[in-house]
A protein has these predicted regions:
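Generic structural motif
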Residues: 26, 33, 48-50, 55, ...
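Charged, amphipathic alpha-helical segments
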Residues: 62-74
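Membrane-cytosol interface motif
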Residues: 24-41
Length: 118
């Protein structure tokens, strides 16, 4: 009985997932914070790998989306959230990252990527 309770506690502890977005020197990374204790690198790309950054429902993304593209969802899944998509390409691997940037991050991305930020 105690083992089941302990297992349930650890499962529910890991269900609490928060995301931290870091945009510095043109590079973008996302860390997952599990149970408010453990940090795990979820995504990382360099400035040269970014193809486009646009709202997730933008028609511009249709030109970049490919079959077999890896999609990483780093959103809160809250209704009405301002979700953006970043498309990056490293070699043959194309990745789409869904995230919720704040106003300061959007302004910084617009400064660094004036032609890639929609």
């Amino acid at each position: 009985m105690a083992a089941a309770a302990a297992a349930t506690y650890f499962v529910f502890l890991n269900l609490s997932v928060e995301y931290e977005y870091l945009f510095a020197d043109g590079g973008f990374s996302v860390d997952s914070i599990l149970g408010k204790a453990r940090r795990k690198k979820t995504f990382d790309c360099d400035k040269e790998d970014v193809r486009v950054i646009a709202p997730a429902n933008s028609y511009v993304l249709k030109d970049y989306e490919k079959q077999g593209m890896k999609v990483i969802d780093c959103t809160s899944h809250n209704a009405g959230a301002d979700v953006y998509a970043l498309i990056s390409q490293k070699g043959a691997q194309t990745t789409k990252v869904l995230f919720e940037p704040g106003d300061k991050m959007k302004a910084a991305m617009r400064r660094v990527f004036p032609r890639k930020f929609i």
